[in-house]
Curated annotation (Swiss-Prot):
Protein name per its UniProtKB record: Rab11 family-interacting protein 3
Species of origin: Homo sapiens (Human)
Biased composition (Pro residues): 1-24, 84-94
Biased composition (Low complexity): 27-39, 53-68
Effect noted on mutating residue 737 to S: Abolishes Rab11-binding
Region annotation Important for binding to DYNC1LI1: where it falls in the sequence: 2-435
Molecular function GO terms recorded: calcium ion binding; dynein light intermediate chain binding; identical protein binding; molecular adaptor activity; protein homodimerization activity; protein-containing complex binding; protein-macromolecule adaptor activity; small GTPase binding
Quaternary structure, from the entry: Homodimer. Interacts with RAB11A; the interaction is direct and is required for the recruitment to endosomes. Interacts with RAB11B. Forms a ternary complex with RAB11A and dynein intermediate chain DYNC1LI1; RAB11FIP3 links RAB11A to dynein and the interaction regulates endocytic trafficking. Interacts with dynein intermediate chain and dynactin (DCTN1); the interaction activates dynein processivity. Interacts with ARF6 and EXOC7; the interaction serves for recruitment and tethering of recycling endosomes-derived vesicles to the cleavage furrow/midbody.
Pfam families hit by this protein: EF-hand_7, Rab11-FIP3, RBD-FIP
Length: 756
């Protein structure tokens, strides 16, 4: 984790001469106003730093030094001696960023004014306004390069030296490497970052909460795999853009400073999409307000991380652990470089690529100064890797440039977006050592040659740097152990995957063998089924052939029977014709008999009516005679009474005679009814015979249009046999019918059958 190094332990600084008379608040400390106090590359100018008490002791002769001391960044032993004052040096100003002593402060003697270095006509030294410095370095008074055409900060102005806090109040002592400004090691505190805009300090706690939620193991770094796994809800392209902002160097891990810088770049609309590269904004412009999309992003990201379980990536290699060649290298952070690289650097901090690029223009470095054209309309300083290739001895942990170390004096640039490290380049240890050496030996030859006194430095800087390097060595050992554990875990995973692949191959072979066996079994079953179907088909064909032979034999037999059947049919036809002739003759005779019967019936009815009239007349006559007989009997009875017979005998005889006469009349009436019924029966029998004859005529009314031989030849054997059976049935019915008619005639009227 790229955290700020703690303060050097007490007693590590070598003793020096007594400080100025009066201490930090004495008269010697107040003689800073008449001239520019001292100009240090990347060193602060101003009052005390509340966060670094007791870190840097007052340097011997710091107040008595009448000139301005120059240092190329935090490297030790690069301070210069006093320089002659120049007319172009502006007076230092006091304010919240750097409290310089007033001109009327008492002191033992006047201090000599150190002029600013003489610049070419294109540049001039100007003091940075107090509202332009980063919020985390309020006591610094940085100076900027400014074009001679303008005395104010404009679009073409570029920060060259970053502001850093002063070591003690009232003195401008030499800054002691990367360990001089002690920062709190707890990153959970919401101090504004060096590159944090003034108007967005309230975003620090929210971003810290999001970062802590993403940092599941609590080591201060978020792996790219974890972040990609979390941010996949935004889409592949958006995740790629986010990782480009949050990890521009391609190290595979994200620190909180990188996270904050990336979110700030996204919020400010960085066109290049890189956290540490960009364009210096105008000083007078207010910081951009946080858009609603940024608030939504932070809120959604925090909710997503707190609601979802942290899942570590165990299947892919991190980008920081992959091996690259000399052509694909990136700048190694000084706080995360290996121990060998730190030792080869000679204890110096990260070089100032701005000055290194000015020294090596032939290797692709480019310095864009104010007043010169730029593709984006702004003046930037960009360090581009040269064409030189160096071997990379050993493996070491590499990380991005931390904005916190940028603010603490690691780089001599006031803007954390000053350097633009290429995400696809990675420098070797020799390259880093060369940069560190050049940074330590840099004398600003492009601007002005400093005095030889700048190469002197206190011994306490070396002690602090040794402590710093020891801590870096411990951190690198921890990183190496973590890398070894990860490599062992990946090797274990690889072994498991190999075993799994072998198991899958064996399973595949077993499946193939099983499939072959199944294919063979199915082929055998199909062959057996085919043989069975062929046998059944052959048996069925044999049965059909046998059946066909039987049908042929039956057909031949039926053909042999056909002539006999034809002869029988002809004989039956002759008999039928004879019967039809007889029926015709009988029909004629029947019609004649019916005519005679009708005439006889008419005659009979006439006689019956005549008989009925005679009967009625006879009945009336009988009635009259009976009455007369009764009258005569009464007279006879009276005469017998007169003769003396008894009346009872005569009355009984009278009744018996009357009863006898009634019975005789009843007998005659019944006989008449019997005769009437017989006549009706005869009439009904005649009607039955007539209807039977008409039915016989209808049966024989069918006309034969074709000859019997033609009909027989045109039909099949089955149809012929069926027709013969029907004809035999009809003949049998006709024979039976004729017999019944003859029997009925013989019973009713046998005279019809008599030959006349």
């Amino acid at each position: 984790m790229a955290s700020a190094p703690p303060a050097s332990p007490p007693g590590s600084e070598p003793p020096g001469p007594d400080p100025e008379p009066g201490g930090p608040d004495g008269p010697g400390a107040a003689q800073l106003a008449p001239g520019p106090a001292e100009l240090r590359l990347g060193a602060p100018v101003g009052g005390p730093d509340p966060q670094s008490p007791g870190l840097d002791e007052p340097a011997p002769g710091a107040a008595a030094d009448g000139g301005a001391r120059w240092s190329a960044g935090p490297a030790p032993g690069l301070e210069g001696g006093p320089r002659d004052p120049g007319p172009s040096a502006p007076p230092p100003r006091s304010g919240p960023r750097g409290q310089l002593a007033s001109p009327d402060a008492p002191g033992p003697g006047p201090r000599s004014e150190a002029p600013l270095p003489e610049l070419d006509p294109l540049f001039s030294w100007t003091e940075e306004p107090e509202e332009c410095g980063p919020a985390s370095c309020p006591e610094s008074a940085p100076f900027r390069l400014q074009g001679s055409s303008s005395s104010h900060r404009a679009r073409g102005e570029v920060d060259v030296f970053s502001p850093f806090p002063a070591p003690t109040a009232g003195e401008l002592a030499l800054e002691q490497g990367p360990g001089s400004p002690p920062q709190p090691s707890d990153l959970s505190q919401t101090h504004p970052l060096p590159s944090e805009p003034v108007g967005s300090q309230e975003d620090g706690p929210r971003l810290r909460a999001v970062f802590d939620a993403l940092d599941g193991d609590g080591d201060g770094f978020v792996r790219i795999e974890d972040f990609i796994q979390f941010a996949t809800v935004y889409g592949a392209e958006q995740v790629k853009d986010l990782t480009k902002y949050l990890d521009p160097s391609g190290l595979g891990v994200i620190s909180f400073e990188d996270f904050y810088q990336g979110i700030t770049a996204i919020r400010n609309g960085d066109p290049d999409g890189q956290c540490y590269g960009g364009v210096a904004s105008a000083q007078d412009e207010e910081p951009l307000a946080c858009p609603d999309e940024f608030d939504d992003f932070v809120t959604y990201e925090a909710n997503e991380v707190t609601d979802s379980a942290y899942m570590g990536s165990e299947s892919t290699y991190s980008e920081c652990e992959t091996f690259t060649d000399e052509d694909t290298s990136t700048l190694v952070h000084p706080e995360l470089q290996p121990e060998g690289d730190a030792d080869s650097a000679g204890g110096s901090a990260v070089p100032s690529e701005c000055l290194d690029a000015m020294e090596e223009p032939d290797h692709g470095a480019l310095l864009l100064l104010p007043g010169r054209p730029h593709p984006h309309g702004q003046s930037v300083i960009t360090v581009i890797g040269g064409e030189e290739h160096f071997e990379d001895y050993g493996e070491g942990s590499e990380a991005e440039l931390s904005p916190e170390t940028l603010c603490n004096g690691q780089l001599g640039c006031s803007d954390p977006a000053f350097l633009t490290p290429s995400p696809t380049k990675r420098l070797s240890s020799k390259k880093v050592a060369r940069y560190l050496h050049q940074s330590g030996a840099l004398t600003m030859e492009a601007l002005e040659d400093p005095s030889p006194e700048l190469m002197e430095g206190p011994e306490e800087d070396i002690a602090d740097k040794v402590v710093f390097l020891e801590r870096r060595v411990l951190e690198l050992e921890k990183d190496t152990a973590a890398t070894g554990e990860q490599h062992s875990r990946l090797r274990q995973e690889n072994l498991q995957l190999v075993h799994r692949a072998n198991a899958l191959e064996e399973q595949l072979k077993e499946q193939e063998l099983r499939a072959c066996e199944m294919v063979l079994e199915e082929t055998r079953r199909q062959k057996e089924l085919l043989c069975k179907m062929e046998r059944e088909k052959s048996i069925e064909i044999e049965n059909l052939q046998t059946r066909l032979q039987q049908l042929d034999e039956e057909n031949s037999e039926l053909r042999s029977c056909t002539p006999c059947l034809k002869a029988n049919i002809e004989r039956l036809e002759e008999e039928k014709q004879k019967l039809l002739d007889e029926i015709e003759s009988l029909t004629l005779r029947l019609s004649e008999e019916q005519e005679n019967k009708r005439r006889m019936g008419d005659r009979l009815s006439h006689e019956r009516h005549q008989f009925q009239r005679d009967k009625e007349a006879t009945q009336e006559l009988i009635e009259d005679l009976r009455k007369q007989l009764e009258h005569l009997q009464l007279l006879k009875l009276e005469a017998e009474q007169r003769r003396g017979r008894s009346s009872s005998m005569g009355l009984q005889e009278y009744h018996s005679r009357a009863r006898e006469s009634e019975l005789e009349q009843e007998v005659r009436r019944l006989k008449q009814d019997n005769r009437n019924l017989k006549e009706q029966n005869e009439e009904l029998n005649g009607q039955i015979i007539t209807l039977s004859i008409q039915g016989a005529k209808s049966l024989f009314s069918t006309a034969f249009s074709e000859s019997l031989a033609a009909e027989i030849s045109s039909v099949s054997r089955d149809e012929l046999m069926e027709a013969i059976q029907k004809q035999e049935e009809i003949n049998f019915r006709l024979q039976d019918y004729i017999d019944r008619i003859i029997v009925a005639i013989m019973e009713t009227n046998p005279s019809i059958l008599e030959v006349k």
